[in-house]
Design a protein with these regions (language model features):
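Short helices/loops that flank or line small-molecule/ion binding pockets
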Residues: 2, 6, 86-89
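Extracellular/periplasmic periplasmic-binding protein-like sensory domains
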Residues: 3-81, 135-151
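Segments of small-molecule ligand-sensing domains
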Residues: 61-78, 84-142
């Protein structure tokens, strides 16, 4: 992102949820780079989750440092949170901690988490119904919601 800015790139950078990071946002800060990401969570989507994560970050200096020095919530944080609970549901459905049994149970797991509804197809790939398009507000060092798209 910094290289793009220094070279005067005039076309937008489009990225996936892995670019939905406060570290990437920091790299774009103060530049004229247009940076868009498609992602699975927008801060404010679950106020209770946001409040809990921000409280934890602000109470733990190491967590704050690991989060880039601020309490911006990246989609991967919310996705990791939901993944933990999905894994618990898969363990319950399997009735076992055997990896093969858990994998076999996964297609039957559905879960409504902070990132929305989560289900799985017959080979275990996640089926998601919501995507957020965010744009880097480089003047204010924040992500701004551009649009939300829901399937179905």
């Amino acid at each position: 992102v910094k290289l793009s800015a220094s070279m005067g790139l005039e076309i937008p950078i489009l990225g996936s949820d892995t670019l939905d990071s406060n570290m990437v946002l920091e790299a774009a800060s103060g530049s004229d780079v247009k940076l868009y990401v498609s992602t699975f969570y927008q801060e404010g989507g679950s106020p209770e989750f946001d409040e809990g994560i921000k409280a934890w970050l602000n109470e733990d200096a190491t967590a704050m440092t690991n989060n880039g020095g601020n309490d911006t919530i990246a989609a991967v944080t919310a996705m990791g949170y939901d993944a933990y609970y999905v894994a618990l549901e898969a363990l319950k459905a399997a009735g076992s901690t055997d990896p093969a049994a858990v994998k076999a149970a996964l297609p039957g797991v559905t879960y409504t988490g902070v990132t929305g509804d989560i289900a799985f197809d017959d080979i275990g790939d996640a089926i998601r119904d919501t995507a957020y398009i965010k744009v880097a507000d480089t003047a204010n060092n924040a992500w701004a919601l551009e649009t939300m798209q829901k399937a179905g």
